[in-house]
């Protein structure tokens, strides 16, 4: 099982978009995936069709009231589950302030996670192959991936995500100011690795909102790759990190689909955004070939993710 925290303390860089659509791509590829929404804004929950209204069980209850993870987890689609967030989560930082070990509450809850049983809660209005109320073997260890969507901060909620994860994915918009914020984020992962979670590693950077036609975007990616190359052989959590070759291009469909409570594959499966996240999922899985991603789409040259070389733009 791979436990991945998707983090960046800057907002609007593609964290939730990447968490949700990568999860959907992996699930459609046959992997069992659970999304944990640790953002008080609950954008990942809304993106997956679960509207936070303050009454539904959520990750807040896991962190503050010691509820089992299985009691709040919902099945969203085939192979895809969600531990939703709620507006109440905004108060968790204060409520947990005096709790010893508050940074590892989520990790301990996942360690105690058992089979869903009666806690299985399918989202109303969705079609599933499995009947509501059926006993499901979906304890934490049965998942292939757990993706945690973090809020735009480096507070106790994000620390919980880092403590409960093995890997970190960093969505990054290719602007120079984003590189300045990256150093603080990497410092935080190093601190967590030293004091809380020695196995934590930064696996990669996902370039989002990419425009291959701008020189700035290309320069930022080049600088980022150069920085990561210099870290090879060091004792830092990012010593083996890479910039994913798949870059998520600007695409209006990616901006539209959250308002419909759908992933890009449910909203616009033939869009460039779907092609990009399909390719990213294949890269995460280590797959190669012309048929990429969960939708088994053949990506046309004009839709294929592009990377820059000395000879121009080529499909990856």
Report the location of each language-model feature.
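P-loop NTP-binding core
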Residues: 1-316
């Amino acid at each position: 099982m791979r436990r991945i925290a998707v983090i960046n303390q800057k907002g609007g860089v593609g964290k939730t978009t990447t968490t949700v659509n990568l999860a959907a791509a992996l699930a459609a590829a046959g992997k069992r995936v659970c999304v944990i929404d640790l953002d008080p804004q609950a954008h990942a929950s809304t993106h997956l069709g679960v509207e936070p209204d303050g009454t539904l069980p959520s990750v807040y209850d896991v962190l503050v009231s010691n509820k089992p993870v299985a009691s709040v987890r919902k099945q969203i689609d085939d192979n895809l589950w969600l531990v939703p967030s709620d507006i109440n989560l905004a108060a968790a930082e204060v409520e947990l302030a005096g709790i010893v070990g508050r940074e590892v509450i989520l990790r301990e809850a996942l360690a105690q996670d058992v089979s869903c049983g009666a806690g299985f809660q399918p989202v109303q209005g969705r079609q599933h192959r499995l009947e509501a109320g059926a006993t499901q073997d979906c304890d934490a260890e049965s998942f292939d991936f757990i993706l945690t969507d973090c809020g735009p901060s480096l507070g106790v909620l994000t620390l919980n995500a880092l403590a409960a994860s093995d890997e970190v994915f960093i969505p990054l918009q290719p602007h120079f100011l984003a590189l300045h914020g990256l150093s603080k984020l990497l410092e935080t992962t190093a601190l967590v690795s030293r004091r809380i979670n020695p196995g934590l590693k930064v696996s990669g950077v996902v370039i989002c909102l990419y425009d291959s036609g701008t020189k700035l975007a290309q320069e930022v990616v080049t600088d980022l790759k150069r920085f990561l190359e210099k870290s090879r052989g060091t004792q830092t959590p990012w010593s083996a990190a890479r910039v994913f070759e798949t870059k998520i291009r600007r695409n209006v469909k990616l901006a539209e689909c959250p308002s419909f409570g759908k992933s890009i594959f449910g909203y616009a499966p033939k869009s460039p955004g779907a092609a990009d996240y399909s390719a990213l999922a294949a890269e995460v899985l280590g797959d190669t070939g012309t048929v990429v991603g969960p939708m088994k789409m053949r990506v046309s040259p004009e839709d294929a993710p592009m990377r820059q070389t000395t000879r121009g733009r080529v499909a990856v």
